[in-house]
């Protein structure tokens, strides 16, 4: 990400050296939109507003589930959402499930999930995917969700800024603000963006052909510098 590149440029080791950012690639043949209703039925998810949150360990402090829970609590307390009209879908492992007791809306924890087909089904079932991490070097979950037509909401502090174009294909909340994260969730629920538009924001920036071309251009520029 450009955020990581900026950190590299400011380091003692890389200071004064050229740093180029080339993003991760996403296989668009593996992450594809699925039918929402069918996906929800298959996963046992009710037909309400669905928010997805996933991580290798959902209880890891750095992943910021506490911010999402606080955002949902804010929405319920201010009556901007009704607790029985929202379902939080969690996927990933956990060493402790104590934090789940604080979730103020209905939720379903799917546990560890593997395979692009299963992940695509989760993203397709959701209306919003939230990444409330303290930082992300890139944000792979966000581009996976976009490719499946799900609107991402995240903080504006790190690698997510490369992926989410604020209020165009998602929402970037003020870092550490559960209230602004809540605003992002409401915005995503009330401003549906077409599946094709969301997916296209990945196709044009993270498809194999686009990223491969960036590598080719970088190699060519390095070779050109060596011959001059």
Q: Predicted regions span which residues?
A:
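Nucleotide-activated donor-binding/catalytic signature segment of Leloir-type glycosyltransferases, i.e.
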Residues: 81-85, 92-117
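A short, well-ordered alpha-helix in the C-terminal region of glycosyltransferases
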Residues: 180, 193-208, 214-217, 221
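Short alpha-helical donor nucleotide-sugar binding micro-motif in glycosyltransferases
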Residues: 121-126
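A short, active-site helix/loop in glycosyltransferases that binds the activated sugar's phosphate group
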Residues: 1-21, 26-30, 34
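Aromatic "clamp/platform" in nucleotide-sugar-dependent glycosyltransferases that forms part
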Residues: 134
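Short hydrophobic beta-strand element within catalytic cores of glycosyltransferases
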Residues: 151-154
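Conserved acidic donor-binding segment of nucleotide-sugar-dependent glycosyltransferases
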Residues: 166-167, 171-178, 186-192
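Conserved donor-binding/catalytic core segment of Leloir-type glycosyltransferases
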Residues: 45-63, 69-73
């Amino acid at each position: 990400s450009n955020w990581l590149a900026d950190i590299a440029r400011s380091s003692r080791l890389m200071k004064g050296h050229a740093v180029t950012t080339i993003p991760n690639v996403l296989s668009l043949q593996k992450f594809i939109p699925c039918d929402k209703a069918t996906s929800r039925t298959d996963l046992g998810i009710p037909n309400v507003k669905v928010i997805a949150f996933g991580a290798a360990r959902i209880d890891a402090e750095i992943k910021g589930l506490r911010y999402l829970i606080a955002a949902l609590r804010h929405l319920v307390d201010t009556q901007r959402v009704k607790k029985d009209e929202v379902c939080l879908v969690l996927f990933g492992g956990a060493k402790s499930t104590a934090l789940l007791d604080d979730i103020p809306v209905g939720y379903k924890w799917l546990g560890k999930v593997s395979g692009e087909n299963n992940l695509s089904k989760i993203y397709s079932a959701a209306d919003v995917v939230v990444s409330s991490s303290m930082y992300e070097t890139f944000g792979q979950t966000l581009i996976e969700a976009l490719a499946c037509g799900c609107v991402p909401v995240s903080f504006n502090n790190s690698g997510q800024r490369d992926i989410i174009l604020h209020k165009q294909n998602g929402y970037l909340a003020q870092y550490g603000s559960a209230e602004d994260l809540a605003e992002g969730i409401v915005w995503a629920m009330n401003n549906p963006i077409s599946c094709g538009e969301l997916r296209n924001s990945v196709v044009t920036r993270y498809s194999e052909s686009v990223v491969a071309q960036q590598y080719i251009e970088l190699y060519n520029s390095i070779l050109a510098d060596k011959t001059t």
